């Protein structure tokens, strides 16, 4: 087979042309602009060769069909017309595949996403494997785009308008069995017979177009214009509830799908190409694409230049609580590494094992996993009340109480019972790693590995180094975090590390606004509208008011008075208000409570007469600017290694609005002069804690940006 081509064709003796997709020099297939010519020449051959009875598209990569289109193509577009032209080229290529006179089959194993699914949907039949890595979806919305090569038209035709809209608006992926049930694939088979079954389909008659397998209310709604109007209205409401009007792609997707449904595919494709071109030029899509590039770049990094990580074959976890259980779960279920849990009580071990079983069982029920895979994963988890089995661990992750003496004892215990090469990773959220490693025999093997709760859902991990941490320890810990499904950033030891340090002033200022009489809902709704997933007062309830109160003095001691927490925390703690964990905080909780109403008794407790006095813009500046300022301090003090790491940490760690690119890209887009002027104005009005970080002033004087 030719190694310089991505698409190669071989016609078998039975007359089936097998087209193998194998992009040279890449681990996964992605579609590039240049491939249109390759596919075009193959189509010329197929259109003129009467001996070909059928066609099969299959991947030459072991774990993926096509992971999507190469996003770099969009950055090469200078304007909306260029991007629109790119979409039309893709549409034309897939139209030719669909219009072939013989049956065309997509044989799918692994990721079939974006442009990959658009190619597969242009085929007449789709057969996929029951492999757990097989997933079909259109994730373009996550890049601020819509599918541009026919996806907005073909998906609703195959699975129905309701299901198609949901998939395109959320980027939701379907596993093999789900795709079969939805009508997206024709058959699900074991990987070993994928090609054989695909060839069988290619030798059958070209199938007639079928209607989506709709039942019940969905069938009734999609059959009439009135019903479809309800579907489009509901889809828009649900999507905008999350998007808050911050993602232009939402409206464009709904309009484009609707165009095709009401005026036919040709009109829909025209609208799709134009909308793709327009969205590609929006600042939101630009920022979302930069995040994609940053995370892709980070996947290739070890955290320590030129140092290869050691292999991690077994992990020990100290503590079977919420964090310990979550860490054990991602180690076994995502990394595929056996985890040994140690706790002082059998209940702790039982809790940790049950935590994993519950989540795996949910996957089985949703058809994301087979029962046999659940059992195999559970066999990777074991527990003990002592250190038996820890002598074979490569990394031990500690997730016990936030107590320095206890954590130092854990270091000593692990050094005694584990191998000399074992890494000790602490999941502390506030204690300095330098102090935890202070009495260690092998301090170079002590590192921070800070997960965020809930561990199985939050994508970030902070890898915290103290001055003595070895490069080998850093590289091995970064590698483990990636296998656990995390996006790790390496940060330097210091109070609050990075994420909690930039979060603290944001929440403190929200609390001060509340004490000044600003209603809780007004503060929270304003920042949700700005783009955060939850408001700062809700976040205080979720993090724990007691936790925030405990962390504040540590930050003040290490970093100064700008971290002083409002006195309100003491009153709240005295009233036993810890937040969501004990169902008593700023909001009401409990099964009988509908929605999420404010607990208005908190106003009288804090002697507040709530009244909206600040505008949305004022609330945003008061809460957000200290976070941006603190991010600049962290860069100045080399707590983070780069603006890129700071942006990824804020987006994945606290939900900083992704469409704004992160704190540093946001400051660049606003202009440092604007940021510094606003900080100086607030410093005069609200106190010295708003004084701009020296780095911001230096950069402004020199005319620099964070991203050149």
Swiss-Prot record:
**Marked site (Important for catalytic activity) residue numbers:** 118, 140
One GO MF term, please? NAD+ binding
- Cellular compartment(s): Cytoplasm
Protein's pathway = Lipid metabolism; fatty acid beta-oxidation
Ranges for the region named Enoyl-CoA hydratase are: 1-190
User: What Pfam families does this protein's entry cite?
Assistant: 3HCDH (PF00725), 3HCDH_N (PF02737), ECH_1 (PF00378)
Region (3-hydroxyacyl-CoA dehydrogenase) residue spans: 310-708
Give the record's keywords alphabetically.
Cytoplasm, Fatty acid metabolism, Isomerase, Lipid degradation, Lipid metabolism, Lyase, Multifunctional enzyme, NAD, Oxidoreductase
Q: Does the record bear Coiled coil in its keywords?
A: no
- Specify the superkingdom: Bacteria
| GO annotation, biological process | fatty acid beta-oxidation
Cross-referenced InterPro entries, in alphabetical order? 3-OHacyl-CoA_DH_CS, 3-OHacyl-CoA_DH_NAD-bd, 3HC_DH_C, 6-PGluconate_DH-like_C_sf, ClpP/crotonase-like_dom_sf, Enoyl-CoA_hyd/isom_CS, Enoyl-CoA_hydra/iso, FA_oxidation_alpha_subunit
Known catalytic reactions:
a (3S)-3-hydroxyacyl-CoA = a (2E)-enoyl-CoA + H2O; a 4-saturated-(3S)-3-hydroxyacyl-CoA = a (3E)-enoyl-CoA + H2O; a (3S)-3-hydroxyacyl-CoA + NAD(+) = a 3-oxoacyl-CoA + NADH + H(+); (3S)-3-hydroxybutanoyl-CoA = (3R)-3-hydroxybutanoyl-CoA
- Listed EC numbers: 4.2.1.17, 5.1.2.3, 1.1.1.35
GO CC term, one of those recorded? cytoplasm
**Assembly and interactions?**
Heterotetramer of two alpha chains (FadJ) and two beta chains (FadI).
Function recorded in the entry: Catalyzes the formation of a hydroxyacyl-CoA by addition of water on enoyl-CoA. Also exhibits 3-hydroxyacyl-CoA epimerase and 3-hydroxyacyl-CoA dehydrogenase activities.
In which family does this protein belong, per the annotation?
A: In the N-terminal section; belongs to the enoyl-CoA hydratase/isomerase family. In the central section; belongs to the 3-hydroxyacyl-CoA dehydrogenase family.
Write down what this protein is called: Fatty acid oxidation complex subunit alpha
**Organism this protein belongs to:** Idiomarina loihiensis (strain ATCC BAA-735 / DSM 15497 / L2-TR)
Its lineage opens with:
Bacteria, Pseudomonadati, Pseudomonadota, Gammaproteobacteria, Alteromonadales
